[in-house]
Amino acid sequence: MAIGLIGRKVGMTRIFNEDGASVPVTVIEIAANRVTQVRTLDTDGYRALQVTTGTKKANRITKPEAGHFAKAGVEAGRGLWEMRLADGEGEGIEVGAELNVDIFADIAKVDVTGQSKGKGFQGGIKRWNFAMQDATHGNSLAHRSNGSIGQNQTPGRVFKGKKMSGHMGAERVTTQNLEVIRVDAERNLLLVKGAVPGATNGDLIIKPAVKA
């Protein structure tokens, strides 16, 4: 798995390409990712990089967190994330090193992972794109009802996984193969074509596309 970075969704805008076409882009701010721990096969049984980014008020840091950051010799960040490493990947990266947006300079497409916007409790029409029932012709109470949820005496139960009303959104979502439009190393910005999961200011994990 290729090394990724943690970023923050700034918002969406558009830019014009060389042909004058309008391209919708999402602006992702990727401040320096500081390496807090290097997982190895010998000590942990797998290879990975643990990173942090951003800042956190001193009075919001727990004692275990403070000790962990102090041991790594890096400034406390707003969270900790791990990136699994393939064999031979990430060699030479040590604790305290900084990873910046310029690692995407030669990358054409990326996968972006974030937490989707929460929608609360929603019905089947919004949650699963069910069709509405008749507006008239005898229907007076079930316009947005889900309809039948099963059979009769056989099997006599509702199958697991049946699409019904319930909580929608606020789950981990990955959007794959987003084209990298621009890498602005001076301002720590990455511009990708299209939308990415989550709300403005939400944390994102950006990795080179696995299906590119």
UniProtKB/Swiss-Prot annotation:
Keywords: Methylation, Ribonucleoprotein, Ribosomal protein, RNA-binding, rRNA-binding. InterPro entries: Ribosomal_uL3, Ribosomal_uL3_bac/org-type, Ribosomal_uL3_CS, Transl_B-barrel_sf. One of its GO terms (biological process) is translation. PROSITE patterns: RIBOSOMAL_L3. The modification N5-methylglutamine is found at Q153. One of its GO terms (molecular function) is structural constituent of ribosome. GO terms for cellular component: cytosolic large ribosomal subunit. Methylated by PrmB. Part of the 50S ribosomal subunit. Forms a cluster with proteins L14 and L19. One of the primary rRNA binding proteins, it binds directly near the 3'-end of the 23S rRNA, where it nucleates assembly of the 50S subunit. Belongs to the universal ribosomal protein uL3 family. This is Large ribosomal subunit protein uL3. It comes from Shewanella halifaxensis (strain HAW-EB4).
